[in-house]
């Protein structure tokens, strides 16, 4: 099975086209604080706790990057009940006149600095503002290692036009915003007095009141379709939509977890503040619980060594057990900081200290 279908976004997709055309940080002691104010609208409180982060022993889908499981302690925090929606992001843009990465002119000189020396410049017709979208018209896949068969660089695709010119978010206020890069998410957080969750915080929230669960509802994989928006059928050519959705779903379309959080698994991937390092867990000192971990000190992905990646969590509507199986709490992948797509969004967190300012 291949587990890297979303590893590269714009940069990697363009690089593939070029080739085709040319032949613990844990510095602050945790107190698992319980001092809190009234929950902000649209957020819930996650109690500080010590829990097992990473792949559970019974998880047959677990990847090496999710191991070994290890004890971590996180302080309490607030987290959004849902992924940030189109309506919420629109309010931010209207208040700030912010322009997302997908809407900006592509800077080839900046991009070139992140590529192997000698990489030829793509044609100007390709270097246009846009984003990656899933190619729903893919009919056959010759080689599952070539993800460009089901991903398309769509000029004009962005958060306002998720499938390119002619598409719209009109009537979709309560759908998760997509085509947002890390920079876009951080700008929203600054405006809203929020921040992105750490990977440990994200897992603590996804676990809710459970302990050692693989999924947000427990360990029963047979009820996946009733609890998360994922791919059913044959990936990537046939989606039988047994869960009622072919692609992205409105937030709150599935049952919440035990503390009232929706869509922590499936629908869209969610950005975190942690840098992605494929061997991060293996490098940790696990003799005692790690206090408020903030992720790896540097980014490293052997399949994308030239760019910085952040951890994204939760999987998306494209996840299928034959390909990525990332509809699990411990699952994670890396995403480049300038990348967006039609299956990645984010949710935010806040601490009592942040809200008191």
Across the structure, where does each feature detected by a protein language model lie?
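C-terminal motif of bacterial Sec signal peptides marking the signal peptidase cleavage site
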Residues: 21-23
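Short, conserved catalytic-motif segment at the N-terminal edge
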Residues: 51, 56-75, 165-168
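Short capping motifs at secondary-structure boundaries
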Residues: 77, 92-101, 192, 355
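Functional-site microenvironments in short loops/helix caps that host divalent-cation chemistry
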Residues: 28-33, 46, 52, 56-57, ...
